[in-house]
Every structure is written in structure tokens, then in C-alpha cells.
Amino acid sequence: MKLWGGRFKEEESKLMEDFNSSLSFDKKLYYEDIKGSIAHVKMLTNQNIIKEEEKEKILLGLEEILKEIDEGILKIEGDYEDIHSFVEINLINKIGNVGKKLHTGRSRNDQVALDMKLYAKKSTEEVIECLKELMDSLIKVGNENNYIMPGYTHLQRAQVVTFRYHLLAYFEMFKRDEKRLENALEILNESPLGSGALAGSTYNIDREYTAKLLGFRKPVDNFLDGVSDRDYIIELISKFSIIMMHLSRLSEELILWSSSEFRFIQIGDAYSTGSSIMPQKKNPDGAELIRGKIGRVYGDLISILTVMKSLPLAYNKDMQEDKEPFFDAKDTVISCLKVMEGIISTLKVNKENLMKSVKKGFLNATEAADYLVNKGMAFRDAHKVIGEVVIYCEDKNSAIEDLSLEELKQFSDLFCEDIYEFIDYKNSINKGIKKEMGYF
């Protein structure tokens, strides 16, 4: 069942027919394909290219096909080359020869470019909504657990932060992701419909009308570019990859924090699994799967970049390979965002263990150095003094705040009784611009 064949003497081989067909995956575009056809038919009527009664028959047929697909009456299957062929041939079977006028002034090249842009817009809006839900949960859980905890560099305890502030760092990452996606939406918001195969059409079609009807800002400026452009797919998968990178970083920390070695958090049962042999195990499989799925999205990005490399203008069949990477990347990032939101919104925070870890890591050493600076010592000298204090504490298995004033004075006469108040963890986190961390 093909939309072409008049210039061929021999039938396409079954092997080639199966190899060439994209229906198994581009069937996802049925809604966009039909909506694009509806807009195209309305424009053809407005421009007196087809008659009003022909428009009504075609529109009725398209709406019926859409309804039958949505209700599961019409299955998207069979020996069709693609979703465009499926819709058009079913339309002709339903309403007769008038259905053959649907494709007037249009090519599958601008048709598929339109379908993919419409689908990309819808998909991006879905991802943005998932990002917003995750960001809301990060804020909510952070506000509910504004506890002091260790901050890390090199995975070594470094300085005091709060659990809330740590989560807000991820909020900032996802906020940037949202902005990147919104920017991508603005760039792709041009309609390729009317570009034809590559050189427009001899019909006096109204591209402005269809662009507006389909929710685009404007039609594309160049027909060749309109059917050849897949930059937006590359850009979106790239942005999905950055989202996945952020999710993998958060996943890694959740996995570490939930381990027996940290015990900072407990991941809810709803997002954990067990072991088939070890009865005691509770595994953070949700976070681990998110961490692992980054590879497939990175792979999708490399796939589409490779497809588009060195392609001459205009459309080439290689571009059929743009869909599966995009579909996979979009589905993966949405599922990962939803699972991460579930993990965050249901986790439990162990306040006591957070504080125990704070006290074990000399996390007030920088504040102790700042104390000496405030007393008149140069920072580099203060840095050396406190480094020596830390060595002394390690030998004694003690914390800085547990040393007596006499012990501290062995390292500098500048130490006074007020050192203890200055390096208190809860006090120090509210000094200077540290107040911006919002500990209360």
C-alpha cells in the first residue's frame, strides 16, 4: 500500500518494503499527522484550491480516523510505508477519490517535518512539566528538613551546609534545564508546512495561515531548510542529556546517602527493591536505574548527530532515523523525572546521623582559621596554624571544639574563650554571607 509507484516497472521486494517501512515507530505521530492534514485542508479551501464540499468530506474522514485510532477501533498496522501512508490510504478507503486531494500542494518531506516539530513541542512541554513537579518536591522536602549536614569536596567532608541548601543546588540545575527547554521551544517554533519536497509549491498556498492554525510563531524562511532541519531534535536530545546528567548526580548522592556507611536518608519502600537471596537487603534500584539510563540518552544524542553528519540538502531517507532516538530520549527522561520526584517526595532524612557526620569531619576548621584572621593573623598563616591543630586533634581522636583553651594556645596566643562560640556549627552557618543558605 503505497503513495507512489507510477514510474516503476517492477514491484518493491518484500525485504526492501519491510526495511523501508517506519510505521512500527512513526505511528506515534498519528495525532500530529492528522492535525497537520486538517490544517492543510482548511488552507486549501481558503485558497480555492479544493471545494468547500470536498473539504467537509475530507475533514469528516480525518476526524473519524482520529477517533477510531483513539478508541482502538482502527489499529495502526499493516503493510504501510509510514504513518502518512496509513492515514491517507485509510482516508481514501473511507471517503473515496476525494481523499486523493488531501496531498495537494504538500510533500511527505514537509509533512513529516511538521509532524516531528509538533510532537517535539508537545514532548518538550511534558518534560518541562515533569521538571517543575520535581523542583516543587525538592523545595518542599528541603524546607521540611532544614538540618545541618556535611558539605563535600572530593567526596571528603569539607564545610557545613544544610540538607535543604544541598537540595536547592539541584533545584538550580533543573531550573536551568527548564530555561534551556523554553529557549529550544522558541527556536523550533516555525512551521515547515508549505515547504513541499524542497522548493515550495506552484499553488498559492497560505503558509502563514497554517502556521498560526497549528500554533507556530511563523513559517520557516527557507523551504530547503524547512524540510532538512533536524537541529531541534539534536538540541532537545542534548538538553535531555543534560537533564539526565543532573539526575545521575542526584541519584549517585541518594545512593550513597542511603547506604549503611552514610545513613543520611532512607529511600521509601515504593522506590526500592529487595534481593532474591539476601532477606535483609533494601536496594535503591530506582536511583540506580536513573543513573544507568543516562547511557541510552547519551547514545540517542550520538545517534542523531551521526545520522545528520554530512547530509546534503534537502531531505534524505537517513532522516527517517531521527525518530527512534528522539522518542526513546523523551520517554526515558520523562520516566526518570517522574521516578526521581517520587523518590524525593517520599524519602526520610536522618537528622541525628547528619549531625554526627558534621562533628567528625573538622567542618569548622575554615571558621577556626577565619577566627584567627579576625584577631589579626594573615589568612595563610591562620591556615597553617589550623592545619597543625587538625593534626593534633587526629592524634587525640578529638574535635577542634573539644580542645581546651590551653591546648589551643599552644598553637597561637590569639585564641580566646570566644573561639568556641565562633566555631559552633549552628552559629557559623549564620555568619557573613553564609546566612544566604537560610538555616533557621
Curated annotation (Swiss-Prot):
User: For this protein, what reaction is catalysed?
Assistant: 2-(N(omega)-L-arginino)succinate = fumarate + L-arginine
Give compartment(s).
Cytoplasm
Q: Which gene encodes it?
A: argH
Which PROSITE patterns does the protein's record reference? Answer: FUMARATE_LYASES
Q: Which organism is it from?
A: Clostridium botulinum (strain Kyoto / Type A2)
Q: Mind telling me what this protein is named?
A: Argininosuccinate lyase
Q: What is its EC number?
A: 4.3.2.1
- Which terms does the record give in the GO molecular function aspect? argininosuccinate lyase activity
PANTHER family according to UniProt: ARGININOSUCCINATE LYASE
Give the Gene3D superfamilies listed for this entry: Fumarase/aspartase (C-terminal domain) (1.10.40.30), Fumarase/aspartase (Central domain) (1.20.200.10), Fumarase/aspartase (N-terminal domain) (1.10.275.10)
